[in-house]
Amino acid sequence: MSLRTVVVIAVVLLAGCREVRVNTLAQGTTTVLGGDQILVVRDDDDLTRLGIHAPVHFRREFGVILLMGPHNRSGYKQIVESIRANDQRVRVVAFEQEPADGGEPSPSYRTYTLWIVPNKVYRKGIRVDVVTPSDSPIATTFLP
């Protein structure tokens, strides 16, 4: 099952089985430093502060961003194994894959995964947990 399919299933569960389409899924890096975080973004200023540029239409969509790092060697990437959701919680299982060749020295950066989700599935107070495959916590947030 592809990552996009898993995201669509999670969003459908959040929406109470209504038909929902995830518009975009993006991965990349940002030089805005910090630790591991899961964030909900509701406007362009939030994205700009994170150094992320994406075509989010905030009148009808919101973004959820998983940030991991920082790293000082090139080549790290995020792997999202699964996303499960119910009416109270979303659980994301993810980790970062180190570069096979050890990477090259680089300025510090963080990796990110951005999900763009329709506003109609937004539910204030939903808990979003990100854990490793061994169930160690990475980050938690609540939809504000």
Task: List the model feature ranges, each with a label.
Residues 10-17:
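Hydrophobic h-region of N-terminal signal peptides that target proteins for export
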